[in-house]
């Protein structure tokens, strides 16, 4: 906002991701901070807050500058505990509230999600960077928290490293995703992209 942009916030609820993708597709968005990509965990694993298989594609295909992070890819969203499919019975869960139960993604699922995130970023026709917060990708994946799983997080990171297009920068940031420093770096990266876009269009 200090740089003169109107900032819109979209919650990663499935509907939120679809709404954001639609606005980007309509040409109403100058740049995207796509930091909470958790809807892909629901899409891939089978949660209730998926945004569809084209999530992460609108900015890429339309050349809109973007900064992408794997925010909350450690979790899949379900409703009350008794509504969770039986096939997930042995998994690690965290009850966020009586209506929402979160399930930890496994290392294998994280590797698959890293491939998907990379594939979507690789579609980009405009400037894009990927930021990876190495200390935690969510509040509850930090050290001492219930979803702390360095092996799964490393599988996610390695899959992104392996599959990301070589001309797309991957920044490993030694913070949690909610640290002020991470937010600053993400915002400055996007503003740098937008500055270049503005300069080139003059």
PLM regions: where:
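Metallocofactor- and cofactor-centric catalytic cores in central/energy metabolism, strongly enriched
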Residues: 1-69, 77-80, 90-91, 102-202
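Conserved anion-binding
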Residues: 74, 95-101
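Active-site gating loops and adjacent loop-to-helix segments of metal-dependent hydrolytic enzymes
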Residues: 87-96
């Amino acid at each position: 906002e200090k740089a003169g942009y109107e900032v819109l916030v979209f919650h990663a609820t499935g509907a939120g991701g679809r709404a954001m993708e639609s606005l980007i597709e309509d040409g109403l968005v100058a740049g995207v901070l796509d930091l909470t990509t958790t809807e892909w965990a629901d899409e891939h694993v089978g949660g209730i807050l998926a945004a569809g298989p084209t999530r992460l594609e609108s900015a890429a295909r339309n050349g809109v500058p973007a900064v992408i992070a794997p925010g909350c890819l450690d979790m899949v969203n379900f409703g009350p505990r008794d509504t969770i499919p039986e096939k997930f019975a042995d998994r690690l869960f965290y009850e966020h509230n009586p209506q929402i139960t979160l399930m930890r993604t496994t290392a294998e699922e994280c590797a698959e999600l890293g491939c998907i995130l990379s594939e979507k970023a690789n579609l980009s026709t405009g400037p894009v960077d990927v930021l990876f917060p190495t200390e935690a990708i969510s509040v509850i994946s930090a050290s001492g928290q219930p979803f702390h799983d360095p092996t799964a997080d490393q599988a996610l990171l390695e899959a992104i490293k392996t599959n990301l297009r070589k001309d797309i920068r991957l920044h490993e940031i030694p913070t949690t995703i909610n640290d002020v420093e991470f937010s600053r770096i993400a915002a400055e990266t996007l503003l740098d992209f937008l500055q270049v876009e503005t300069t080139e269009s003059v």
